[in-house]
């Protein structure tokens, strides 16, 4: 699928205007949440690599205008998320999680539920991106997660 920059930046009336705006928002949301998670436990050393990314000033910042740079950084950030998850333990998800939102308000919530929100936030906005791409006439193929889940081999 080929996309021109003018298509990526076209304001299509989405929450974050465009494909590039929405993809940047997903990235920014991930940085914000992962930075909060880093402060939750000293054992989350994978999250120390977050310092390489610029700190966003707002949820609609554009950190990347080049889709290739965004793609490269997205892959790196996803690898960081995978490493971070390997550092978590089941008991981590039962603990309280204290954080401040972007407006400075403090919250105490169950860490497991906050992590669920973290992943659901990505899913929500990725769904918007697939809609925007469809509106641009791009075929992105099947996006159902079930397609990528391998069949289990059971002995009967």
Predicted segments, located by residue:
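Charged/polar, solvent-exposed surface patches and flexible loops
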Residues: 2, 10, 35, 69-72, ...
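Short, contiguous alpha-helical
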Residues: 5-55, 101-156
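Acidic catalytic patch
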Residues: 87-102
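Helix-adjacent hinge/juxtasegments
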Residues: 43-88
């Amino acid at each position: 699928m080929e996309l021109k920059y003018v298509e990526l930046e076209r304001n299509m009336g989405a929450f974050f205007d465009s494909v590039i705006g929405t993809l940047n928002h997903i990235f920014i949301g991930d940085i914000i949440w992962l930075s909060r998670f880093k402060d939750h436990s000293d054992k989350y050393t994978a999250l120390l690599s977050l310092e390489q990314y610029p700190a966003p000033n707002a949820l609609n910042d554009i950190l990347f205008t080049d889709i290739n740079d965004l793609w490269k950084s997205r892959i790196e950030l996803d690898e960081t998320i995978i490493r971070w998850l390997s550092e978590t333990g089941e008991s981590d998800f039962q603990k309280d999680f204290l954080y401040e939102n972007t407006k400075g308000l403090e919250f105490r919530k169950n860490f497991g539920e906050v992590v669920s929100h973290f992943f659901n936030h990505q899913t929500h906005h990725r769904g918007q991106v697939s809609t925007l791409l469809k509106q641009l006439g791009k075929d992105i193929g099947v996006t159902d997660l079930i397609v990528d889940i391998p069949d289990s081999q059971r002995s009967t």
